[in-house]
Amino acid sequence: MSAVTGLVRSEIHGGDVAVLTLDRPRANAINPALVADLRRAVADAAGAPALLLASSQGLFSAGWDLPTVRTFGREEMSRFLADFTALMRELFSFDGPVVAALPGHAIAGGLILASGADERIAAEGKGEFGLSEVALGVPIPRAAYEIFRYILGDRGAERLAAAGDNVSAVRALEMGFLDRIVPGEDLLDVAVGRARQLAGRSRAAYAEIKRRARAGTLARFDRASDGDPFLDFWFSEEARGRIDQLVARLTKKA
């Protein structure tokens, strides 16, 4: 069974793995429509034994659609941030296994999106992984930071977010963000196989272990938006200047 929800293709692979494929040219840049479609697809897959996040392109996601979100006023940006944060919680708290197949770059919001998976499998090659928000004059949102603390620990999350460097797949594996690197032609098969393997565990036991392991992180995640200065940074003079410069470069390349 397959379905297309706007910018996300949904397919039940082999009867047990719900494959959600990001399909937004170009670069799967994250805008409100993609967030809404992905949230809808995740909700529709709630009963699936396992969930797989994939991409129709040679990369996973280049992050937020800056030329679009740059035009948002504070209220619209606040809604977008709230919806993106809700998506991250829905992925991170999904009670079945969630695997992400990363064919290439996962940058900024794209890396945050991938962090919602239980395991991340990347293709060999020149893909880069990083949190580049600091280069734009903004920190990553507090709620998202809690997920990186869960994956990398306090020091690892700080180094990734504060340095703003993009790293190779090999380095991301060494850091503990990636779980496996495979040849690109094998990526989808390996990721589906891993999701199916995890789905073969007791669903109730797997869900209980996830709840125990993530309870503290989710509690901090739910408190994180209160007093988060992200929007103050986003609308600061420094950030606006940096974002405008990047958007100008992106527009010129297009």
Report residues per predicted region:
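Glycine-rich beta-to-alpha transition loops that act as phosphate-gripper elements at the mouths
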Residues: 101-107, 161-165
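Terminal low-complexity tails and localization/encapsulation signals of metabolic enzymes
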Residues: 2, 242-254
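Conserved CoA-thioester-binding segment of acyl-CoA-metabolizing enzymes
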Residues: 1-56, 75, 89
